[in-house]
């Protein structure tokens, strides 16, 4: 089944935010770079997705045209088969991604990127609902600790576990880097 790798929001905008933590980022980059290397060596197309949103001001690292809307430092270089700029959580909303996937005969997508429970999860659910098979590579996603409305802190690991729990066997196959690449063609 023809596959594409979706590299979602792996951009320099995130380290500019107060919630950014380097904890987990190095492991994330190791996994995501292994996905990139594996995809390139197998001829799997890679789609680069950037998130832009909010006011067009110098203080917004996600603003269209911000110098921070560029690949995250440490991300392996790759030639994108398609680059899209999204303004919503799903990479399939308001972008040419769905059309490109159909035109290129893509039936499975591998999801990796930042943030696990936001744009990666939302794109996974949306892609599944639209009929694509999805491999969600949790260790090639990154998120950060969050505080619930009740004041409880959830660790990034807890958030990832929750995301994987709600996606598995419903919206996606959970896969390691090696498993996702082995399934890809």
Stretches found by the model and what they are:
Residues 1-4, 31-42, 60-185:
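Active-site-adjacent betaalpha module
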Residues 5-10:
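N-terminal nucleotide-binding beta1-loop-alpha1 segment
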Residues 14-18, 55-58, 145-147:
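A short acidic, helix-capping loop that chelates divalent metal ions and anchors anionic groups
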Residues 15-25, 151-153:
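Acidic/histidine-rich helix-loop elements
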Residues 39-54:
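Von Willebrand factor
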